[in-house]
A protein has these predicted regions:
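Non-catalytic accessory regions used for complex assembly or targeting
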Residues: 13-15
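Bacterial N-terminal signal peptides that target proteins for export
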Residues: 1-10
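Bacterial signal peptide processing site
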Residues: 24-27
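C-terminal motif of bacterial Sec signal peptides marking the signal peptidase cleavage site
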Residues: 18-22
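First exposed extracellular module after export/assembly in secreted or surface-exposed proteins
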Residues: 30-166
Length: 166
């Protein structure tokens, strides 16, 4: 009798373990790895890229990598067309002087700086510099290279991903 109870208990426990292990937290449902053409496009654009990790954001393929001494997110469409690169700057002191001066003169200069990045686009005549600040709210400030404030975006309760322009 003890043997039967033990066997039943073991069977129930094993069933529970297998049931929960099969319910993984897979956020990449439907993820398709990037094609060789997309991987080649990254190598052509950033030949020295290392620590490459691919993810899919919506319909885009994004390579998280290190290149030129900085952390980058390089965005491609399914046709291996480069759409955008976001480069982390790690500090407002890495901004161009005109952008730093504009930020320091803004009404957000006393807010906590959360993130600083450069957005580069293939078909744009300029680069955008994004300073993310927090103080009760979370705001992305987009500056031109000359220091002009292009626009601001409240990302307090929303998606703070910098998406490619379409």
């Amino acid at each position: 009798m003890k043997s039967l109870k033990f066997s039943l208990l073991a069977a129930v426990l094993l069933s529970v373990v297998f049931a929960f292990s099969s319910c993984g937290d897979d956020d990449d449902t439907g993820y398709l790895p990037p094609s060789q053409a997309i991987q080649d496009a990254l190598k052509k654009l950033y030949p020295n890229a290392t620590a490459i990790k691919w993810e899919q954001k919506g319909v885009y393929y994004v390579a998280d990598c290190q290149a030129d001494g900085r952390e980058k997110e390089v965005w491609f469409d399914a046709n291996a067309t480069w759409l955008m690169t976001e480069t982390e700057l790690n500090s407002i002191n890495n901004l161009p002087p005109a952008v730093l001066t504009a930020f320091m003169g803004s009404s957000y200069s006393n807010w906590v700086v959360d993130d600083v990045a450069i957005l580069e686009y293939p078909n744009e005549p300029y680069t955008e510099f994004v300073v993310t600040v927090e103080q009760g709210k979370k705001i992305d400030l987009y500056f031109s290279e000359g220091g002009g404030l292009l626009h601001e975006k409240d990302v307090t309760n929303g998606d703070d991903t910098h998406w490619p322009r379409t």
